[in-house]
Amino acid sequence: MIELGQSYSTIQAMTKQKPLKSLRQRVKENQTPPNRSQNHLGILRPSFSQHSRERKMLHSTSWLDGLRGISATCVVVHHCTLQWFGWHIHEPWFPGQSFLKLPVIRLLISGSPHVYIFFVISGYSLSYKPLKLSRQGRFDEAASVLSSSIFRRHARLFVPTTIVTFFCAIMTQLNWYGKAEHMPGVAVPAWEPPHLDNIWAQLNNFAWNELLFMDPVGRTVAKGDPGEQVKQLHNPYDYVLWTLPVEFNSSMVLLMFLMAFSRVESRARMAFCLAMAVLFQCFFIYWALFLFFSGMLICDLRLELGEALSTRAPSKDTRSWSKHLFVRAIGVGCFVLSLCALSTPHLAFGGREAPGFVTLASMIPERFGDQLLMPIAAIGLVLTLDHHPFLQVLFTNSFAQYMGRISFALFLVHGPLLNTLGHALGRRFIALIGGDTEERYLVAISLTAMVFWLMTILLADFVYQYVDLASVQVSKWAYQRLLRTEEQPGKYEWKSR
């Protein structure tokens, strides 16, 4: 990410090297002068249509971005199904029922499994650079990275959230939110934030709720049933944001652990990390911390194996094609097994009687509910992908990488859009086409989904470019400006770029 100060100095250098050409010179060289209207409208262009931008090079962990993008897409689909269909499509599969309920396929309309995947990815991503620097003996640099991450983490998560939910408060005053009575029979009625008498009361209510939502200390740690977390941690202006306080608290605990153990011998650190993960899950059912620490452990294991391979003498791979095929078969088997375990129906809604899951569900203690098998399956999925690069191609394609880039913005905007545009379109298409038969209803919802997804992708892309990236750049800039030099330990040195 280019910092603001660095980009300014780069522009200065460019202008010194190549003086600006006059309009006459540009016309002579058949260069059309810039169009002001095009410049102003340029901010509305989605990032994928800007052909001048070079394609981002893939790196060793790019598949994590793609996996995050696919999971974010499935979460949006899940929330759409809750507002456009009844609970029946999320029930366990039984012979003769819809194919959408089948294992693996049901992940396309599920929500909880992808939340677990998000948290494993977050643990891996936050740990990767500090662990890599620590293993290289660059402890000061690792400490600097951790310090920067801790400083910027709250702003990284909550500044874009505050900006988006501010517009939710405005939309509430404009009566853009739908009412539950217009869509009967759906699993979750349309959500409407608190509606106050005037704009000033609305903004005051928004400000207080936002401050409570961003509380870095008083929020409860994710424990037990995620359904209870939704009730305790949700933002009144967007109920899907309940995972952000969980993400913040879990990331702070992980970063504190990394800071404490960055200088510890690698295998000892891995042993402590494993012990902490087991303790969090088995004794306290802190499933979010379990997932974050497991993500860190997977990352540390990958770096450990990389070091072991680098110390070996170079030799030709003499394995036969049958051994290669066997290794790939193991990878595919673990991948499919992880997806099947992630597809476990909610035990409280008939999952213990679902075909194929009866024996497995009977082995899970009651106290864990759904917070044992699916988290372990999410860990298994990331672990499998990390050690079988041939499977990573599923998440390094252009679509997955693009969805990964806009995943946080997509997460922020889809809830408000679903409860305003998605709800209104659903009512109007049903009124136009009819919802008296299943076929008519599906046609109406399909048209609704097409328009909703188009607008959601465009808005998410806009928020990604001008809110998400900007908040990252500003937080980095602020951190750099507040740093003090080691030569003057008692005075703050304001850095000029």
UniProtKB/Swiss-Prot annotation:
<feature type="glycosylation site" description="N-linked (GlcNAc...) asparagine">
    <location>
        <position position="35"/>
    </location>
</feature>
<feature type="transmembrane region" description="Helical">
    <location>
        <begin position="241"/>
        <end position="261"/>
    </location>
</feature>
<dbReference type="GO" id="GO:0016020">
    <property type="term" value="C:membrane"/>
</dbReference>
<dbReference type="GO" id="GO:0016747">
    <property type="term" value="F:acyltransferase activity, transferring groups other than amino-acyl groups"/>
</dbReference>
<comment type="pathway">
    <text>Mycotoxin biosynthesis.</text>
</comment>
<feature type="transmembrane region" description="Helical">
    <location>
        <begin position="107"/>
        <end position="127"/>
    </location>
</feature>
<dbReference type="InterPro" id="IPR002656">
    <property type="entry name" value="Acyl_transf_3_dom"/>
</dbReference>
<feature type="transmembrane region" description="Helical">
    <location>
        <begin position="157"/>
        <end position="177"/>
    </location>
</feature>
<comment type="similarity">
    <text>Belongs to the acyltransferase 3 family.</text>
</comment>
<keyword id="KW-0808">Transferase</keyword>
<feature type="transmembrane region" description="Helical">
    <location>
        <begin position="443"/>
        <end position="463"/>
    </location>
</feature>
<feature type="transmembrane region" description="Helical">
    <location>
        <begin position="278"/>
        <end position="298"/>
    </location>
</feature>
<keyword id="KW-0012">Acyltransferase</keyword>
<keyword id="KW-0472">Membrane</keyword>
<feature type="transmembrane region" description="Helical">
    <location>
        <begin position="69"/>
        <end position="89"/>
    </location>
</feature>
<keyword id="KW-0325">Glycoprotein</keyword>
<protein>
    <recommendedName>
        <fullName>O-acetyltransferase PaAT-1</fullName>
        <ecNumber>2.3.1.-</ecNumber>
    </recommendedName>
</protein>
<comment type="function">
    <text>O-acetyltransferase; part of the 2 gene clusters that mediate the biosynthesis of fusicoccins, diterpene glucosides that display phytohormone-like activity and function as potent activators of plasma membrane H(+)-ATPases in plants by modifying 14-3-3 proteins and cause the plant disease constriction canker.</text>
</comment>
<dbReference type="Pfam" id="PF01757">
    <property type="entry name" value="Acyl_transf_3"/>
</dbReference>
<feature type="transmembrane region" description="Helical">
    <location>
        <begin position="375"/>
        <end position="395"/>
    </location>
</feature>
<feature type="transmembrane region" description="Helical">
    <location>
        <begin position="406"/>
        <end position="426"/>
    </location>
</feature>
<keyword id="KW-1133">Transmembrane helix</keyword>
<dbReference type="InterPro" id="IPR050879">
    <property type="entry name" value="Acyltransferase_3"/>
</dbReference>
<feature type="transmembrane region" description="Helical">
    <location>
        <begin position="329"/>
        <end position="349"/>
    </location>
</feature>
<keyword id="KW-0812">Transmembrane</keyword>
